[in-house]
């Protein structure tokens, strides 16, 4: 038993005027006053801890709720019918037919990854995997979305190698393939990198599990790793003498992950589900046991009583506040009927997973009682803990937005040598260069069900070995576009992820997101956020695919300067037969090349604008989601295409270069019909475009015309190892080997000798 002296509910009643460090825990004056009003007294130390954790921006979404409701308002009945579990659950779950369901979610672990890159990123993977486990699913793959400062920034040199190592270590040890992602470099992320992790899992429809505690007398069981002192510095639980006896205890603010413990926990959970001994389940992530138990209680039909004396600990003399707020990894919390407790414990013992009965569901509706050292340290309504405050913060379009949207001058090469130099500069730029330095550290094919991953438009996975049914997943974002016009920027991210999935032949069925923004106390940031949410919600409605869930990460800034607003959008698609999915590697035999979609002189927020040294300005490309739907109608179920590659950053030039490099093929292309300007044809970033390879051109042209998809014949592939380009009045050749050398060397040269990589911020 702990020797820590508790601040009990009885003490709180006797000492109403005791000063408490609520500000150090992130609570505002009015929030502290509201807690006292709810309880009818001052909170105990443990209650103050729980409310501060659960009312944090991370757990409560207090600044974003008013805007996130728009997702629900724009979801039609038809869209909702596809979702088995949606916004508010640990992850979205989609019914894909034949009794199968897929669950997926993306979440941020930004600030921990800056402080301690390896563990921050590793536990980001661990946390999102447990979200998927908590839905009753087997995790089958991960993806990542990474943002760093400039390539030569010392912080980037320190953080990136550690982040990549953390992701690869944890994911590889779990045996989960990393099937895709995106890495972006921009000055705005210096000092505040973004580490967003996505996980996808599969389950049978009838095996779906939800996070709620119901059934009076049912037991609450904590299982997994023991609870320690790691991961609680971030919520400032021990920021004052009121919460700590002595200063010798040094607490890591970043959680420490054990992927092998999580691997065992996955198998243990799946056997528990199969045995039918789980009523409700919740993973322990941000907010730890405080979050898991109070959320279970709030979602249930009764109350809950928790005894912290039964929690397996790995540190001595832990206070109630420490036990509740600890974010030790690899832990789950389940609700189990009394008759199934013995079987539950047997299964945990089989897998050598530590477990303990720590509480029970009571018949006292909306009452959450926590006991430590035999004393009551929390007695509060769980609904008030879980719901948190709701803020409608000021929203104001930034004063400089009009000026930002004015189109500035950019260099526009005309002669052959300048165009070739521009092309090589683009493919070698940090924005577009090969990510093999990163992705080769990930195992993409473990488990044997990865169909597409390396250099693919979208990750493609087989989920049913008998039918070859599978899914395609892509996640995309553009902070540059979103900075210029947040509504359009979010829709462009949605359009690109949708198009990536479509280009494999998959039918898009659902959306997830992770919205990374600056401080919500900045009215300009809140305007960006609101506009992005509306753009994403309206776009999803137009495409007819529901937003199944998401995550919000605020306070991403260095000093007063926020990051580029970065709404990461993930799209899930379904393939009836993954063996018929369309890849993006040109076949060895020669094929005709076609460009689908129109090209306009659109360079606002483009990579050429960035690489050429022009400031970020102008308007992003126009997005017409009906054009994306037309492309979907052309691709889904079609056997016309030998290969496909969507166009996005870097435009047609980047796509042609990657196609040639990956297949070691040459090509003759005539761009005179694409746009009068060869420069625009190559480097503009207009949306709704895909390059395809086919030898059934007449059929393609006919079908595209029927659907209203603009189609332009570019030329044909060959074995020359040269891209021969023809414009309206310009012709030139560029060597594939020259492009390859430019494309492949940038990241290895930058990080081959990264000094201080993965150093911890003190």
Swiss-Prot record:
| Binding residues annotated for Mg(2+) 1, in chain numbering | 107, 551
Q: Please classify the protein's predominant subcellular localization into one broad category.
A: cytoplasm
Does Metal-binding show up as a keyword for this record?
yes
- Gene behind the chain: purL
Q: What is its EC number?
A: 6.3.5.3
Residues of the active site are 58, 109
Q: In which pathway does it act?
A: Purine metabolism; IMP biosynthesis via de novo pathway; 5-amino-1-(5-phospho-D-ribosyl)imidazole from N(2)-formyl-N(1)-(5-phospho-D-ribosyl)glycinamide: step 1/2
Q: GO biological process: what's one of them? A: 'de novo' IMP biosynthetic process
Where does this protein hold substrate? 108-111, 130, 255, 327-329, 553
Q: Which GO cellular component does the record give, naming just one?
A: cytoplasm
- List the catalysed reactions: N(2)-formyl-N(1)-(5-phospho-beta-D-ribosyl)glycinamide + L-glutamine + ATP + H2O = 2-formamido-N(1)-(5-O-phospho-beta-D-ribosyl)acetamidine + L-glutamate + ADP + phosphate + H(+)
Per UniProt, where does ATP bind? 61, 105, 513, 550
The source's domain of life comes to: Bacteria
Which InterPro entries does the UniProt record give? PRibForGlyAmidine_synth_PurL (IPR010074), PurL_linker (IPR041609), PurM-like_C_dom (IPR010918), PurM-like_C_sf (IPR036676), PurM-like_N (IPR016188), PurM-like_N_sf (IPR036921)
> What protein name applies here?
Phosphoribosylformylglycinamidine synthase subunit PurL
What compartments host this protein? Cytoplasm
Pfam families in the record, alphabetically? AIRS, AIRS_C, FGAR-AT_linker
Identify its protein family.
Belongs to the FGAMS family.
- Complex and partners: Monomer. Part of the FGAM synthase complex composed of 1 PurL, 1 PurQ and 2 PurS subunits.
Q: Which GO terms describe its molecular function?
A: ATP binding; magnesium ion binding; phosphoribosylformylglycinamidine synthase activity
Function summary: Part of the phosphoribosylformylglycinamidine synthase complex involved in the purines biosynthetic pathway. Catalyzes the ATP-dependent conversion of formylglycinamide ribonucleotide (FGAR) and glutamine to yield formylglycinamidine ribonucleotide (FGAM) and glutamate. The FGAM synthase complex is composed of three subunits. PurQ produces an ammonia molecule by converting glutamine to glutamate. PurL transfers the ammonia molecule to FGAR to form FGAM in an ATP-dependent manner.
Going by the UniProt record, its keywords in alphabetical order are: ATP-binding, Cytoplasm, Ligase, Magnesium, Metal-binding, Nucleotide-binding, Purine biosynthesis
Q: Which residues bind Mg(2+) 2?
A: 131, 283
